[in-house]
From Swiss-Prot:
One function term, GO molecular function aspect: DNA helicase activity
GO biological process: DNA replication; DNA replication initiation; DNA strand elongation involved in DNA replication; double-strand break repair via break-induced replication; mitotic DNA replication initiation; premeiotic DNA replication
Keyword ATP-binding: yes
SUPFAM superfamilies reported for this sequence: Nucleic acid-binding proteins, P-loop containing nucleoside triphosphate hydrolases
InterPro entries on file: AAA+_ATPase, MCM, MCM7, MCM_CS, MCM_dom, MCM_lid, MCM_N, MCM_OB
Binding-site positions, ATP 1: 366, 406, 408-410, 511
Primary localisation category: nucleus
Organism listed in the record: Schizosaccharomyces pombe (strain 972 / ATCC 24843) (Fission yeast)
Native organism taxonomy: Eukaryota, Fungi, Dikarya, Ascomycota, Taphrinomycotina
Family of this protein: Belongs to the MCM family.
Location(s), subcellular: Nucleus
Statement: the UniProt record of this protein carries the keyword Cell cycle: yes
Highest taxon in the source lineage: Eukaryota
Protein's name according to its UniProt entry: DNA replication licensing factor mcm7
Disulfide bonds: none
Amino acid sequence: MALPTIDLKIPEYEECQHKITDFLSHFKQEQVQDGQQNQDISMSDAGDEPFLKSKYMDILQKISNRESNVINVDLNDLYEFDPSDTQLLHNIESNAKRFVELFSQCADALMPPPTVEINYRNEVLDVIMQQRVQRNENIDPEHKGFPPELTRGYDLYFRPVTRNKKPFSVRDLRGENLGSLLTVRGIVTRTSDVKPSLTVNAYTCDRCGYEVFQEIRQKTFLPMSECPSDECKKNDAKGQLFMSTRASKFLPFQEVKIQELTNQVPIGHIPRSLTVHLYGAITRSVNPGDIVDISGIFLPTPYTGFRAMRAGLLTDTYLECHYVSQIIKNYTNIEKTPQSEAAIAELNQGGNVYEKLAKSIAPEIYGHEDVKKALLLLLVGGVTKELGDGMRIRGDINICLTGDPGVAKSQLLKYISKVAPRGVYTTGRGSSGVGLTAAVMRDPVTDEMVLEGGALVLADNGICCIDEFDKMDESDRTAIHEVMEQQTISISKAGITTTLNARTSILAAANPLYGRYNPKVAPIHNINLPAALLSRFDILFLILDTPSRETDEHLAQHVTYVHMHNEQPKMDFEPLDPNMIRHYISSARQYRPVVPKDVCDYVTGAYVQLRQNQKRDEANERQFAHTTPRTLLAILRMGQALARLRFSNRVEIGDVDEALRLMSVSKSSLYDDLDPSSHDTTITSKIYKIIRDMLNSIPDVEGNERSLTLRAIRERVLAKGFTEDHLINTIQEYTDLGVLLTTNNGQTIMFLDPDLHMEN
């Protein structure tokens, strides 16, 4: 009986090499200027002749001229070069490790001579190779060869096909994917130090001086001991080989751990992790906390040491990285496109950018306009200053939201952690002091004690959102004190003494001491946070849930609309999507506003007044927060953030007024609760007072009636936190009462009896 057989379709590698050579030498693309993407070329004038350029031959020429050391082979180019030949593309994706070597061999064969004079003193390997060539001129030809890995001055990587390809999650990887080129999405949880990895080991004989090379392709190898040269064999000398470190070739190596995202984990499961190996030029391309798509070759690796004895036939798996794509890029790395720049210019021309951006933050959450404005300033941030003596003044803004349950504090925190390029969300009960700062761990690769960053380190140059801030243990909460002002974390444990950067903004949410706010107890006792911590927050919002027929009705309508239509109610403008908000903030953060002399004097007077108000509140037992010199810095930081939103390099008095208004509004609900007479002041009367004060500020010129334009009133009223509807209702109400008069089609407003209302 004949044994069953199967027909394995083994690719013809010689034929594949011919196709690869043809692709590398003949693939051309339209010429792209520096800083532009390929897709932007289609926007050029239709009448221009496209200038085609050989893409990969140019890359090889740069490598030959020592101007580059990376070849990125985009498999989209291979598909575009010959769409009918899908077999080669399939072979590469299913057996990528073998085709890396084939592409490298073809690149070696096509490597052009340098077109510029090369200085061989740049690298140690160049000097050694030059000496080897001179030495081998008189040696037998069979001993003149060098391993290809030794002579290659480049790293070759594949970029996967992007069309109709959905990234894998870690738990979706199967045995059938081994050896394949694939893309995995996850969050980076740990990165090791970059270490040299041996790829070609060089030995020198102590008897005859013969040089032997050994290519290393696995974790472990057996070093050569006896010289294989003919001279030693003839003389029966058995020369001993010694490793020559400077003549060997090392590649930078970094091990990275990625973990599944929250939305990839099934119900009741815990996130899985995957080890990723980075070699060569792509090391240091990811940081802990980054959400990335990593493309690479999924490979098995046997366990070593004692773990091999326990594992038996089991093997571990890892991903050999070829390409890294950041899902959410940092503000400095966001690529500007003509479309995004045009959208930003259109947004600026429309006016009220501050209002539109604030309303675009969590639009499905009703109200909280002033809270959203403060969160917008948190995203933009102030200007970090470094003085000549090394002193550093932080520019990041810290905000604390405290108040009754059910006012959407946690939802706002969740949204900010997602819209920020680097956002970490954690809770007070689920976080320890070590989990927030740094923990000492044993590195599984080197077996050394290393530091692993916590939530605050992961949020470096980003935002750390801490929910249930009041429920943290006091010993854990003290770990945040240094971060909130000095923006560093000092570690001294397990023989490691160092300082880590934690240049992060803190956004905290807390409930009052008794669950709900108790108006019979002083405000400072309701909050139950130490004064040293409260003073580090630039602005502290107290959000009380007080019954109000009008507000409750609007809130209920808003919530029911969201549940009916799965979207927020229609606004007078289209809310900006998070990506557009990131692009605008990225442009705004390029400005570094300065504070002129007149604004400095104005801020000084405002700060002195705040201190006087605090003294009065302490006497009346209405103290809400401590006014300290840090409050002065907070005003300046928020003013700088507002100037950045205007794309201005100067802070104006209006910016300081808005910062002071936000500080006042943050505790307005408290004063409304303490002062029952304040409930008698309606929204319309507040807006009327603003209009009256504006009219009083106009100088009285004999023969001219004092009037205001609707545009000026609208800008002032909206800046105070009111809406367009509030303004229209106020003007209509006071016009019906015979107090105001509108002219010029409603664009000009004046008082019917100016003298009477100037006195009131």
